[in-house]
């Protein structure tokens, strides 16, 4: 099983740094997936949710408000203005979901992108 390194960095520090199977990113032109050995690219990230499939097959979601991504064959680096990890115990998850909704609503993005991101965060909340 091939893995790649994924790093998500905010102005406050690194919030995710691990090997993953794949990641789905909210690009400025729509969502796109990245697998190990992906072609090199740099792209804008829009308000939305990063969905990560970890090495053990579990999924983790991180809500972001905007940023950039640099992809190469072995590593994907997301540099974002703000991010909230949507995982943890039930009480922590409820707080994280509220923080994620606030983060997304503060983004200077189109209302369609914000509504889509909030909807995705709410769906994640229902699945836990």
UniProtKB/Swiss-Prot annotation:
Lineage, uppermost ranks: Bacteria, Pseudomonadati, Campylobacterota, Epsilonproteobacteria, Campylobacterales
Any single GO CC term annotated in Swiss-Prot or TrEMBL for this entry: plasma membrane
Principal subcellular localisation of the protein: membrane
Organism (species): Sulfurovum sp. (strain NBC37-1)
Keywords: ATP synthesis, Cell inner membrane, Cell membrane, CF(1), Hydrogen ion transport, Ion transport, Membrane, Transport
NCBIfam families, A to Z: ATP_synt_epsi (TIGR01216)
UniProt similarity note: Belongs to the ATPase epsilon chain family.
GO molecular-function terms, A-Z: ATP binding; proton-transporting ATP synthase activity, rotational mechanism
Quaternary structure annotation from Swiss-Prot or TrEMBL: F-type ATPases have 2 components, CF(1) - the catalytic core - and CF(0) - the membrane proton channel. CF(1) has five subunits: alpha(3), beta(3), gamma(1), delta(1), epsilon(1). CF(0) has three main subunits: a, b and c.
Cell compartments where the protein resides: Cell inner membrane
Gene (UniProt): atpC
Membrane topology: Peripheral membrane protein
Protein name as annotated: ATP synthase epsilon chain
UniProt function note: Produces ATP from ADP in the presence of a proton gradient across the membrane.
